[in-house]
From Swiss-Prot:
Xref: SUPFAM superfamilies: Single hybrid motif (SSF51230)
Protein name: Glycine cleavage system H protein
Co-factor requirement: (R)-lipoate
Residues annotated with N6-lipoyllysine modification: K63
GO CC field: cytosol; glycine cleavage complex
PANTHER family, per database record: GLYCINE CLEAVAGE SYSTEM H PROTEIN, GLYCINE CLEAVAGE SYSTEM H PROTEIN-RELATED
């Protein structure tokens, strides 16, 4: 399982990368491996307000549909449109090509409440 150390993680298996005053969000390698082959990604539009721990979109795999949960609150400023035509990026490159959204956070310090890579790996391994 790939768990980059520089990212923060939610208990719902989303990752967060702080990029200046913005935050990029996607799903973890563990999540994509559990879901199986991703066939569709549904994401909100730019300008949508998201709230921490609330659903903001979904991913559909050959096995199931899973909601995406916002790890922190903010306003969406960018959506990864390439996932419309290439949902397989979620399986192939969950931390690079398959980021889901970029937000302008309401409070960047919310990131501090998320799990470190070590904490996330421990949670997943306890399963």
């Amino acid at each position: 399982m790939n768990t980059p150390k520089e990212l923060r993680y939610s208990k719902e298996h989303e990752w967060v990368r702080v990029e200046g005053d913005k935050v990029r969000i996607g799903i973890t390698d563990f999540a994509q491996s559990e879901l199986g082959d991703i066939v569709f990604v549904e994401l909100p539009e730019v300008g949508t307000e998201i709230t921490a721990n609330e659903p903001f979109g979904s991913v559909e795999s050959v096995k199931t549909v899973s909601e995406l949960y916002a790890p922190i609150s903010g306003t969406i400023v960018e959506v990864n449109e390439s996932l419309n035509d290439n949902p397989e990026y979620v399986n192939e490159s969950p931390y690079e090509k398959a980021w889901m959204i970029v937000i302008e956070p309401k409070d960047l310090s919310e990131v501090d409440n998320l799990l470190t890579a070590e904490q996330y790996a421990a949670m997943v391994n306890e399963g």
